[in-house]
Amino acid sequence: MSGEIVNRVANSPLITMDLTDYAPTKPISVLDIKEFLFEEIFLKEKEFRASLKEFDFSNYTNKVVALNCSSDAIVPMWAFMLVTSYLNTANSEIHFGKKEDVFQQIFADNIDSIDPSEFEGKKVIVKGCGQIPLTETLYIAITKKLQNTVSSLMFGEACSAVPVFKKK
């Protein structure tokens, strides 16, 4: 018997997928509509439009923007459309929501853009931890994306994987 140690994990056909590889890489800027509201409470159309005209939207050029309103004000839908029209001229990538929500939305979109054919018939382990906190939504998205393609889908690490799905 040889004393050689064999790394069975390295020699296995398993593919380890780290969802953090699909995390958004561009920084997300926040534009809070409350800054354009009268006393940050309600919208006066004339003043709202005037403040938007005076605002320097060039700070958002070619950036990802989380557009939201952090106050409890009731903001009409057209106000978000109007702000979006200004951001569009700055070539911004605009999403509605808080910064973290937009991050998760883009993250899920990145997972959705994965080509499942590259995992056709393979055994895939989705890592359970990484540098970025991952939400249940992301694990649901990858399961939906890969289940009909892979031969086996697992969660965790190769040394302690939890079976999720196995093609029969």
Task: Report the location of each language-model feature.
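Short glycine-rich or small-residue beta-strand-to-loop segments that form or flank ligand, phosphate
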Residues: 64-70, 95-97, 123-129
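Peripheral peptide segments
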Residues: 42, 104-111, 136, 143
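Short, non-transmembrane amphipathic alpha-helical segments
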Residues: 80-88, 138-147
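A domain-level signal for the structural core that forms small-molecule/cofactor-binding pockets
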Residues: 48, 52-53, 94, 128, ...
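Extended, charge-rich low-complexity interaction segments
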Residues: 116-140
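Gly/Ser/Thr-rich loops at beta-strand to alpha-helix junctions
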Residues: 70-77, 129-136, 160-161
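N-terminal, charge-rich interaction modules
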Residues: 1-74, 91, 149-152, 156-157, ...
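Long, charge-dense
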Residues: 79-118, 156-161
